[in-house]
Amino acid sequence: MSMSSMSSPSSAVCSPDHFSPSDHLCYVQCNFCQTILAVNVPYTSLFKTVTVRCGCCTNLLSVNMRSYVLPASNQLQLQLGPHSYFNPQDILEELRDAPSNMNMMMMNQHPTMNDIPSFMDLHQQHEIPKAPPVNRPPEKRQRVPSAYNRFIKEEIQRIKAGNPDISHREAFSAAAKNWAHFPHIHFGLVPDNQPVKKTNMPQQEGEDNMVMKEGFYAPAAANVGVTPY
């Protein structure tokens, strides 16, 4: 592989007209003495890794020619004119820009990873939107009716069954009095087979119309004005 070296940026550089037109001219910088080397590479080796020997320090370089491909010498001669010569400073700038230019060409030919939709993007596109959560009011816990409420309810039903013409207000008043005067019934202290012991209590004013019936108070008339609890 033929080559010519350039000793320093300030020295004159020979025109590479003596290279074969069937080969490709590339410029490589020696990593030991920093000399610019003009390398004549055959077209069959443009995309291979070749070994270049520096003509100044005899250092061997392993060069990947894919990143050092530059226009052919005859094309550079036509662009620069018949009496123009290569400037080493321009060659250094071209060498620095060659890898970036190659990367730009590769990026234009092949899509980047950012252009390829990821699996997460496809999953998000086909994902069914979830319904917003509904703020349900807290469920009200059903309270167990107390012994008093159960007794009053059952007592009102019993009084109305014995006297259908009685009003609900009078039945409630009688049921409340039965609850107050017979506390032993509340806790089941008396068995069902034993008779209920009646309590001898003096009747107060306003209770003349109340009569004892089966151990409970019950109104004697339907028009008794008693205020419920």
From Swiss-Prot:
Cofactor note: Binds 2 Zn(2+) ions per subunit.
Organism: Arabidopsis thaliana (Mouse-ear cress)
Superkingdom of this protein's organism: Eukaryota
Phenotype on disruption: Leaves polarity and growth defects.
Residue segments, region Participates in DNA-binding: 120-180
Tissue: Expressed in abaxial regions of young lateral aerial organs, and in primordia leading to cotyledons, leaves, flower meristems, sepals, petals, stamen and carpels, but not in roots.
Protein's job: Involved in the abaxial cell fate determination during embryogenesis and organogenesis. Regulates the initiation of embryonic shoot apical meristem (SAM) development. Required during flower formation and development, particularly for the patterning of floral organs. Positive regulator of class B (AP3 and PI) activity in whorls 2 and 3. Negative regulator of class B activity in whorl 1 and of SUP activity in whorl 3. Interacts with class A proteins (AP1, AP2 and LUG) to repress class C (AG) activity in whorls 1 and 2.
Gene encoding the protein: YAB1
Signal peptide segment: none
Protein name, as recorded: Axial regulator YABBY 1
Zinc finger (C4-type) stretch: 30-57
